[in-house]
Amino acid sequence: MTHPKELPFSTLQFYATAPYPCSYLDGRQARSQVATPSHLINADVYSELVKSGFRRSGIFTYRPYCDGCQACTPVRIKVADFIPNRSQRRAQAKHSDLQTSVTKLTYLAEHYDLYLRYQTARHAGGGMDQDSREQYAQFLLQSKVNTRLVEFREDDGTLRMVSIIDVLDDGLSSVYTFYDPEPPNASYGTYNILWQIAQAKALQMPYIYLGYWIKESPKMSYKTNFQPLEALQQGEWTPLPVVDPAATR
């Protein structure tokens, strides 16, 4: 592993994007801070950037940089202290027979078809349900860091879920997961996070990075179901108290 003093942070540049419509809070404008150049952001550098609140989309490494808004809060699960609740144990038992296959980033039409079905069912009208093959590949199949693609299949080979995961020096970063939208209450997403937690435990890694949590966004509320959760606030990772979903309505 590269020593932190050897990482090329002094040669990285950071710039702010122009404002664009926020994907999570209606009527808000968002901005991002982008780390460049991408060819210097290897696995070691990216691990350090994630600890500072960055994420990636393809080879685009960014963090929220919005004017007058700090709603996006980076969160991570403390793996060693996690204890599943009753509904999570049900999801674990329900899908324990799924067969997993961990591979390098590869395009398969079967994956792309499942991606479109997922987007159409879960995020219709948001734009991603119209993603071309090229847009899908740029979003999920381009990476300069240590990334894995994980398939989840039934015994008969039916594809149920695909997850893109980055391997960091202190944990796993959940990049994106898409799954069969039918039936709607199958809890595939919950099972996926439980699977990642189990993988991190096996690798003796302390954290699962879940990206950003927004208190006012119902789409993000599932993340607080995985406790204990830490949040990056004012430059420090501190415990995030359990949030009552009713309090955000």
From Swiss-Prot:
Its EC number is 2.3.2.29. Its main location: cytoplasm. One of its GO terms (molecular function) is arginyl-tRNA--protein transferase activity. GO terms for biological process: ubiquitin-dependent protein catabolic process via the N-end rule pathway. The keyword Hydrolase does not apply. The keyword Acyltransferase applies. It is an enzyme of class 2 (transferase). It is found in: Cytoplasm. SUPFAM superfamilies: Acyl-CoA N-acyltransferases (Nat). InterPro entries: Acyl_CoA_acyltransferase, Asp_Glu_LeuTrfase, N-end_Aminoacyl_Trfase, N-end_Aminoacyl_Trfase_C, N-end_Aminoacyl_Trfase_N. GO terms for cellular component: cytoplasm. It catalyses: N-terminal L-glutamyl-[protein] + L-leucyl-tRNA(Leu) = N-terminal L-leucyl-L-glutamyl-[protein] + tRNA(Leu) + H(+); N-terminal L-aspartyl-[protein] + L-leucyl-tRNA(Leu) = N-terminal L-leucyl-L-aspartyl-[protein] + tRNA(Leu) + H(+). Keywords: Acyltransferase, Cytoplasm, Transferase. Belongs to the R-transferase family. Bpt subfamily. HAMAP family: Bpt (MF_00689). Functions in the N-end rule pathway of protein degradation where it conjugates Leu from its aminoacyl-tRNA to the N-termini of proteins containing an N-terminal aspartate or glutamate. This is Aspartate/glutamate leucyltransferase. It comes from Janthinobacterium sp. (strain Marseille) (Minibacterium massiliensis).
